[in-house]
């Protein structure tokens, strides 16, 4: 999630990212900050996703699920079969009981230990930001998603071009691996003046 000032120079590798979020999760400070900051990413992204993913039994992979904010929104929209993955064990421990079918500690900068076409859709909200998950993860999301499935994500506007997400997104379109459904700038964390690109793409196989 975070802002550039908080984490650009602090998070240099996976271990530091994990430590940062484990510390942020202490005393449930993470969720309190999300409320205080008026973090709208999960709500807005899930609203867009639910407009196109009509099957409420769809098997969904929530990549970078944190404390389950996206899961809460998915449940509100009637979805019930979703799995969560996050790098921070501490944040996973704060996920409400019985919200997800399965929770796993995963480094999304590495190949995801899932079969090809295992999921109907992938959600990734607040994870493409400074010092976090890089563009190659998008190819892994496509790999684990079935044909015609959806990949819905946010990208912090500060890294969209700097990290090469703009080029990766276009490359995947040119390679006919997915097609754009929606892509627009959202407020994300309005109270901190942090915007993000919100994308919804449909997988082609």
Per-region residue spans from a language model:
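Class I SAM-dependent methyltransferase Rossmann-like catalytic core
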Residues: 26-40
